[in-house]
Regions:
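Short, charged/polar N-terminal "headpieces" of proteins
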Residues: 1-58, 151-160
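Mixed-charge, low-complexity intrinsically disordered segments
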Residues: 45-84
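Short leucine-rich amphipathic alpha-helices used at interfaces
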Residues: 76-78, 83-85, 126-128, 133-134
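C-terminal charged interaction modules
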Residues: 94-160
Length: 160
């Protein structure tokens, strides 16, 4: 019989996800509150969101400067191109959000809904209640590190 070891799962924040009617979906997001990279990933998520918005605006300007043509079917060439750019924008937004939410976290929150323009802001609004917890944990971790190593430094000085 093999022996096993397992790390403690302290300070894991689990957030359940509900559908539009308020029913529990059984899905949840997990955040390791002692992960020092979590606030950094949140910052990177915000930076990517801003880059994505800039990308979308620039692409729309480029498309608008070109002459419109008749499309293959109902939509004009410009309309088709703008929709393709929007699809790319949504893909980039989901990748940015997944940096913080974890793999497929955005899909869990969308709960079957397709990505949409204000998705980032809506998800950000949902996460506002946990953001102070992240800051407190980041400060707490920094204080624990200071405390741990400052005590060793003073003990070392006392022993000398």
């Amino acid at each position: 019989m093999a022996d096993f070891i397992q790390l403690k799962k302290d300070n894991i924040l689990k957030i359940g996800i509900k559908d539009i009617e308020g029913n529990d979906t059984g899905e949840h997001l997990e955040f390791d509150m002692e992960d020092i990279e979590l606030p950094l990933r949140l910052n990177e998520c915000e930076a990517r969101h801003r880059k994505n918005l800039e990308f979308l605006k620039m692409q729309f300007v480029i498309i608008d400067k070109k002459e419109d043509k008749k499309g293959k079917f109902i939509l004009s060439w410009k309309e088709e191109e703008k929709l393709k750019i929007l699809q790319e924008f949504y893909k980039r937004e989901m990748e940015a959000l997944d940096l913080f939410l974890g793999q497929n976290g955005t899909n869990k929150l969308l709960n079957g809904r397709k990505p949409y323009y204000s998705m980032y802001e809506d998800i950000n609004d949902m996460l506002v209640p946990i953001l102070p917890k992240l800051k407190l944990k980041a400060d707490d971790i920094a204080n624990k590190i200071k405390e741990k190593y400052s005590n060793k430094a003073t003990e070392k000085n006392v022993l000398e």
